[in-house]
Amino acid sequence: MVTKERNAALKIVMLVASALTLHPQQALAQTAGRPLADVVGKTLCTYSKTAKRQAANLAQTLQRASSAAKQSRQAQQLAALALAKLPDYKEAAATLLIYATHKIQDAQASIENWTGENTKLVGQAMYSSGRIDELMLLLEGHREDGANGQDKTCLGAAAGGNTVNEFVKTECDTESGHNIEADNSNIGQAATTLSQESTDPEASGGASCKITANLATDYDSHANELPLLGGLLTIHNAGGFKTGQSLQTAAPTNKLISALKNKGAGVAAKLATVTSAAPTSKQELKTLLASKGERAKLQAANDEYNNWKPGAKPEDFDAHIKKVFGAEDGKDSAYAIALEGISIEAPLGGGQTQNKQLYSMQPKDLMAALIGTIAELQTAAATKPACPGHKQTTTESDALCSKIKDANECNSKHFCSYNGTETDSAKKCKYNATKASASDAPVTQAQTTSRSETPAEKCTGKKKDDCKDGCKWEAETCKDSSILLTKNFALSVVSAALVALLF
């Protein structure tokens, strides 16, 4: 009977030994001194390498959005000036003004993505990377100097536990320091991949790691297990990594990476957003207008400008927008060429100015040009009749003029002139038909029968410093500014320019 029992026991021992021989990669229950399996270490490092790049990715995204906003504000100013300087391209300039506004809004929305939880998640990624790197460097550093294959290590081969090549610097990328570059990596995918690692964290051999030694005996009394990385790994109280707990089983409730696993895909999508800008150069305009696909980007802005009534919107938008800009596939548009012909005096400081081509003007120059243009248009609008379509009768005009007693005020009206020799005070300011027909800035008139200056006579021959009060210095010549714009158009340009200045 005893012999049979001994034989049965021997068979059990042999079966266990056979199982260990056939499956050397399978770790036993936690064993004091066992190293972390290199497979698990590399999984942690792969995640860490991605996580530490998220701050660089965020910096890249914010820089793109900020640059797009700045350039689009410049494009907005450029379009506002074009609206004033190119009456024949009013719709083109207005379309680009609205398009630039949309681009500014897109850039602002991209920046606002990072005012709350998304930035916190990027911070969490960086924090988790730091935690992993330090643990991995600690484990890899606890090893016997010498060739691979020795068994005194805290980071060893999953099958056997022997020392492996050092890999933390490369796999975790711990040597980057402050030179980490953006790489558009997906933190959500990285967290998901880590959460799927099912390998037992404890290597199947080795017993020399001091970090995973028996906590209870080596420290006299250590009642609890030792969690690492918020519980992703756990050193058992009796030593070794806790059996039955892989990264896959620990990840769902792990606060270090669970939020990144659940929300990281959204963060990655926002980090990958590239905010484009409105055009500010001739080449950028060419790109935007040189193909049907690119021109389609202007449709929302053009629709907003036209506010089409039902049935009025062109069926072929591309044909319409090509006509608006004078555009052809692969060529500079007529609008872009017209902009190239505009030069404006820009202040240099100290009372000095410099004539600059519109494309070459910086935001500061464009702002000054906008302010000057608005002032010119306001002056021109103020000298226009209140109702251009209404022709006053002599009786109506005399009634209006006769109420004015001051000579300067009388002469400031485009249809009144002051007669200083008239003895009747009610008749000194009278209607001047010649002056009214010219519909230009007023001139002083001693007698109602004297001739008023025409717009051309008033401005022709004046030097640059004297070219003002309804005149405009353009192309080295003093010209009448009122012939360039009607009152209604002038006011619309002022409004558009003011809108641009508000952004």
Curated annotation (Swiss-Prot):
Membrane topology, from the record: Lipid-anchor; GPI-anchor
One of the GO biological process terms: symbiont-mediated evasion of host immune response
Propeptide part(s) removed at maturation, as residue ranges: 481-503
Subcellular location: Cell membrane
Main location: membrane
Highest taxon above the source species: Eukaryota
The entry's keywords: Cell membrane, Disulfide bond, Glycoprotein, GPI-anchor, Lipoprotein, Membrane, Signal, Trypanosomiasis
Disulfide bond residue pairs: C45-C172, C154-C209
Protein name listed in UniProt: Variant surface glycoprotein AnTaT 1.1
